[in-house]
Amino acid sequence: LVEQLVRHNQSEDLQYAVYCSRKSYNNERWVYHGAKTEYVGLNANGIQSIPYDIVSLIKAARQSDVVLILGVSGCAFLPIFRLFSQKRLIINIDGLEHRRDKWNKWARKFLKFSEKQAVRYGNVIVTDNKGITDYVLSEYGKPSELIAYGGDHVLQDISADESDAALQKYGLTANKYSLAICRIEPENNVHTILEAFSQTPDQQIVFIGNWNKSAYGNDMQEKYSKFDNIKILPAIYDLRILNVLRSNCKYYLHGHSAGGTNPSLVEAMFFAKPIIAFDCIYNRESTENKACYFNSSKILIDILNDSSLDFENNAKSMEAIANRRYRWDIIAKQYESLY
């Protein structure tokens, strides 16, 4: 998000300052696409993310007119922040982190407290999905600005030769495989998708993710890699290869169930492929109820075997929605209107 806001800034009156973790960069740049960059000597993720956010907030209070906060982990500090700064705070609360299964009870309590402080002390609250917009209104009685994510940065000119080479590398034939890409976590319904394909041997799936990062991932890989129609691949970070795989798949499977508009879903929609998504309010809002939806392996099997479904219209609708709602020039202007 920050990358694209900076890249799409066309205003001479708007100057971004971005706070970065020194731990994540070997070479520090002090200007990036016109934005000033400042470095904090703490990790931006994990337990250090909280002091990292606090240090960044203190620096921003001294140097900026408006402070844009992405995520709520550091917002527990806002009651203290307001004692010495009345700077305008725009806070994107992201997904509902306190509801995610991967956090223990105490982490969830802390994240819920931080979310509450964000909504209380923020001048403007940004939500990325109508499901979260409705949640903030019902939970806190406060309206929020609905701004999603862009996905058109994935569109690239890729030659037929480059595309053929990538497909050949992975032993794939265009439009003969389904594709899923995600972090390998239970809330992304990896098991639900793989179980369905294990029972439909005539349907091939390529599943890309960080399989070796958890016991869950290792278990999934061990259980399902033995099926001839299931190709399990490690995480791929080359955007061009990912785009070849996305643009040549038969169906795109999206199993995310946790809060908000998911960037990987938005990106996939630009490739005009049929989307089969887990049935939750966030995915239905993102796709305007025009994709196919499953909430069990059985229903997914039924979808895969149902030749009467209008997958062509599904694909056209996904592309049309993406171009109407999820272009970065639109998203950047929406944010700039809040400053």
Task: State each model region's role.
Residues R88-I91, E115-D164, L172-N175, A180, ...:
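Donor nucleotide-sugar binding/catalytic pocket of nucleotide-sugar-dependent glycosyltransferases
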Residues I58-R62, A107-I125:
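Membrane-proximal helix-turn-helix segments that form the acceptor-binding/catalytic region
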Residues L309-Y339:
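A charged, aromatic-enriched C-terminal amphipathic alpha-helix characteristic of glycosyltransferases
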